[in-house]
């Protein structure tokens, strides 16, 4: 994956890796080509022949190809796709990124409110925000340094509880930003944390949820990759862990979990965005997260795990590794997915598709959802692809943060109410 963007004022917690020169995406275009039976093979050939990056690769007919085209290839690309339908996602990707990354300044000690969600923020400001937010609700929450990334950055978490007290109820675990470029997931998981804390004893549904569950929110599962997207490469996906005897760093952390690790839903190529790692669970951050989940499970168990991603507007259930196998709890997973999608749509009209991961988006090996369900024995394990469906993709404008948070919270509240009701 190519690199992008420098934010001169970004503070980085720890710097142990070599500085990578930022790349300017000015003039790059992101173009969607819908595929069908008569053009999917040709679209695949064009991507290969021109050595183009993709945000979405069309593995079969009917899937969209979201293609990043550099200025030097635009003429050749447009000639090759002549006669095909296309949609322009970003006319100038560099301009879109500059608009997205106009971070609002944050002063530590500020009383967090809705204004935080009007902008994206630096990694260091996220740490300050989470500590400030927790500081307003000290009697029923804690800020946790859950462990360190490969480069030594803090993996932050908020732990929230209700009337029963700390560690007295089955846990809910939310993960965000396991894929570094999916910035909207950082903001949406923080929006839910803010809502669970600030609306407790004000909103009956939220109060019931917080009283019935021990809530753990990890907004930045992959801090090294996240920081890297803000200094060098806006479209970076993996962590930043070096790979022995390979020029390409990083593991796809959501292909590194030690369950059904090998298969067509991951790659053995260190330069692939879906590189599974050298061994199951060898990602530094995965070791941290597995240790945390096991520790949480040892209290009252884990009632639900949700791994938040973008983009695609999907809410999905196990399995990722197989398109034919189904867990015994499949019917319940499907029911809760529909409840989530219906309640979410009622807020802003945003449609979500639901279904098993492998059948709904693509096959995935070594993913968090399958691992949580089958190894940790989490009762309900789910994943989401947040806004949008491709109009802006990974570079989602900041004015969509609040509506994304509002609708995702509504879907989550409806789903958890259904879990409480049994």
Swiss-Prot record:
Q: Show which residues constitute the signal peptide.
A: 1-17
Query: Does the entry annotate any disulfide bonds, and if so which pairs?
Result: 248-271
Binding residues annotated for substrate, in chain numbering: 179-182, 237, 254-255, 310-311
What are the UniProt keywords, alphabetically? Carboxypeptidase, Disulfide bond, Hydrolase, Metal-binding, Metalloprotease, Protease, Secreted, Signal, Virulence, Zinc, Zymogen
The domain of life is Eukaryota
Q: Which InterPro entries match?
A: M14A-like_propep (IPR036990), M14A_act_pep (IPR003146), Peptidase_M14 (IPR000834)
Cofactor comment: Binds 1 zinc ion per subunit.
Residue numbers covered by the propeptide annotation in the UniProt entry: 18-112
What GO terms are given for molecular function?
metallocarboxypeptidase activity; zinc ion binding
Peptidase M14 domain: which residues? 119-419
Q: What protein is this chain from?
A: Probable metallocarboxypeptidase A
Q: Which organism does this record belong to?
A: Trichophyton verrucosum (strain HKI 0517)
């Amino acid at each position: 994956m190519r690199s992008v963007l420098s934010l001169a004022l970004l503070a980085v917690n720890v710097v142990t890796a070599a500085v990578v020169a930022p790349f300017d995406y000015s003039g790059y275009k992101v173009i969607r080509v819908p595929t069908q039976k008569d053009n999917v093979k040709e679209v695949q050939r064009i991507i290969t022949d021109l050595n183009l990056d993709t945000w979405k690769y069309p593995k079969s007919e009917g899937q969209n190809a979201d293609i990043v085209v550099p200025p030097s290839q635009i003429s050749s690309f447009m000639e090759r796709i002549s006669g095909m339908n296309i949609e322009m996602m970003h006319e100038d990707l560099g301009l879109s990124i500059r608009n997205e990354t106009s971070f609002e300044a944050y002063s530590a000690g500020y009383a967090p409110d809705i204004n935080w969600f009007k902008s994206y923020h630096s990694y260091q400001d996220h740490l300050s925000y989470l500590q400030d937010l927790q500081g307003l609700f000290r009697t029923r929450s804690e800020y946790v340094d859950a462990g360190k990334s490969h480069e030594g950055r803090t993996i932050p978490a908020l732990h929230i509880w209700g009337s029963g007290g700390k560690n007295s109820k089955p846990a809910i675990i939310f993960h965000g930003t396991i894929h570094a470029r999916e910035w909207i997931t950082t903001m949406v998981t923080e929006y839910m944390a803010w809502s669970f804390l600030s609306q407790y004893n004000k909103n009956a549904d939220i109060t019931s949820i917080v009283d019935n569950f021990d809530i753990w929110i990890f907004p930045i599962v992959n801090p090294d990759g996240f920081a890297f997207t803000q200094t060098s490469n806006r479209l970076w996906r993996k962590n930043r862990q070096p790979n022995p005897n390979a020029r390409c760093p990083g593991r796809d952390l959501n292909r590194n979990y030690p369950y059904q690790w090998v298969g067509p839903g991951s790659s053995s190529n260190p330069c692939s965005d879906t590189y599974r790692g050298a061994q199951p669970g060898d990602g530094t951050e995965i070791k941290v997260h597995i240790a945390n989940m096991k520790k949480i499970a040892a209290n009252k168990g884990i009632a639900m795990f949700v791994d938040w991603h973008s983009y695609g507007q999907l809410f999905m259930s196990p399995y990722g590794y197989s398109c034919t196998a189904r867990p015994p709890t499949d019917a319940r997973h499907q029911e809760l997915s529909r409840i989530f999608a219906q309640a979410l749509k009622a807020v802003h009209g945003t449609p979500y598709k639901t279904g098993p991961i492998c059948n709904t988006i693509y096959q995935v090996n070594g993913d968090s959802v399958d691992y949580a369900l089958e190894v940790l024995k989490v009762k309900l394990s789910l994943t989401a692809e947040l806004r949008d469906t491709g109009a802006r993709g990974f570079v989602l404008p900041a004015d969509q943060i609040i509506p994304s948070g509002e609708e995702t919270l509504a879907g989550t509240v409806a789903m958890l109410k259904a879990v409480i009701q049994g």
